[in-house]
């Protein structure tokens, strides 16, 4: 299976190269990056050494499609949409890591990503409707049959996996859900950003994107589909001075206030017992980003506050792996007919 990595020099693309080079069932057929096109891969990334030391090539439909079966688009929001239809028309399957196809309505995307919509004049509502939301834990069968996969955002991944079992079975109320998340700086990408400078964000913690963060509507869209009811929730992200890692604390109201922490843990464990990358921790053991760093795992924990009938669900992921490229490889595996976790048995180098 030949895979083109488009946008290979960003954090998502770099992770993709590092993962795919170790999976013998795949061959990297193209490395695309306009800023570094014409230079050799090992010259730019000697720490992810490729034996054939390929050139990084200019991003174009012709270059991408000449030898590829699948295109992994690791591009900024909006840019993926300029390539997707042309690649599909040439018979390639597409896995998109941007937000371009996460919404079932192009109008919704334009509303949320208005800045990008002003630059990229899209008319591919049909592809928005066709795209499969690439969260394997809820869409495994659809992903395996799809030709266009929209990989979830990192925050939605860290929030939806803990929420899905309780929403799908009506354990928690649809109103009053609060998500409090923290992300490492790599979530902001590789482009220079003053807010991500060490002297700006080091030794500090700050919230951003209150009320109107783009991932709020993405979480709400999927949560509403899962629950069968319209859900509006409160999501607040924070930036923490670590390079990679994401932690979410989710609060909800139990429909049955008699449920205990053990009850809710058993439900969570049973729901995900067939997913080897999901670890449900014992009651009173709470996940740390240290435990999942450099892995595709998600650690979950749950606690019930019996005083007020609230449930607290916690999750920890590596935002560049389960929150981004590792999840994309899970989707690639499913589309290729392989085990979902092929090549993703990654070791955490604690501490």
Swiss-Prot record:
Gene3D superfamilies: Dihydrodipicolinate Reductase, domain 2, NAD(P)-binding Rossmann-like Domain. The keyword Hydrolase does not apply. It catalyses: N-acetyl-L-glutamate 5-semialdehyde + phosphate + NADP(+) = N-acetyl-L-glutamyl 5-phosphate + NADPH + H(+). GO terms for biological process: L-arginine biosynthetic process. SMART domains: Semialdhyde_dh. Pathway: Amino-acid biosynthesis; L-arginine biosynthesis; N(2)-acetyl-L-ornithine from L-glutamate: step 3/4. GO terms for cellular component: cytoplasm. Its main location: cytoplasm. The keyword NADP applies. It is found in: Cytoplasm. Keywords: Amino-acid biosynthesis, Arginine biosynthesis, Cytoplasm, NADP, Oxidoreductase. It is an enzyme of class 1 (oxidoreductase). Disulfide bonds: none annotated. Catalyzes the NADPH-dependent reduction of N-acetyl-5-glutamyl phosphate to yield N-acetyl-L-glutamate 5-semialdehyde. This is N-acetyl-gamma-glutamyl-phosphate reductase. The gene is argC.
């Amino acid at each position: 299976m030949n895979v083109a990595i488009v946008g290979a020099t960003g954090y998502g693309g770099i992770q993709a190269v590092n993962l795919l080079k170790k999976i013998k069932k795949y061959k990297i057929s193209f490395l695309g990056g306009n800023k570094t096109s014409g230079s050799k891969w090992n010259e730019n990334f000697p720490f992810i050494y490729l034996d054939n030391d390929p050139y990084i090539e200019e991003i174009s439909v012709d270059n991408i499609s000449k030898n590829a079966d699948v295109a992994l688009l690791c591009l900024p929001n909006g840019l993926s949409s300029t390539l997707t239809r042309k690649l599909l028309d040439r018979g390639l399957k597409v896995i998109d890591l941007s937000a371009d196809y996460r919404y079932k309505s192009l109008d919704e995307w334009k509303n949320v990503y208005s800045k990008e919509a002003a630059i990229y004049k899209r008319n591919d509502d049909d592809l928005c409707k066709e795209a499969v939301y690439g969260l394997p834990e809820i869409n495994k069968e659809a992903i395996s049959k799809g030709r266009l996969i929209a990989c979830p955002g990192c925050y939605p991944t860290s929030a939806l996996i803990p929420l899905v079992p309780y929403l799908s079975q009506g354990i928690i109320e649809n109103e009053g859900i609060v998500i409090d998340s923290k992300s490492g700086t790599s979530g902001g990408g590789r482009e220079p950003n003053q807010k991500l400078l060490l002297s700006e964000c080091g030794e500090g913690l700050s919230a951003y994107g209150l009320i109107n963060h783009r991932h709020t509507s993405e979480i709400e869209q999927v949560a509403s589909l899962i629950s069968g009811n319209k859900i509006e929730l409160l999501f607040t992200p924070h930036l923490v001075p670590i390079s990679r890692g994401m932690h979410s604390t989710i609060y909800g109201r139990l429909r049955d206030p008699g449920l205990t922490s053990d009850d809710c843990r058993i439900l969570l464990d049973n729901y995900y017992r067939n997913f080897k990358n999901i670890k449900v921790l014992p009651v009173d053991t709470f996940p740390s980003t240290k435990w999942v760093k450099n892995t595709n795992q998600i650690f979950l924990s749950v606690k019930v506050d019996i005083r007020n009938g609230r449930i607290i669900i916690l999750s920890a992921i590596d935002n560049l792996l389960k929150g981004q490229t590792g999840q994309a490889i899970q989707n690639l595996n499913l589309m290729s007919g392989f085990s979902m976790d092929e090549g993703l048995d990654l070791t955490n180098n604690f501490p």
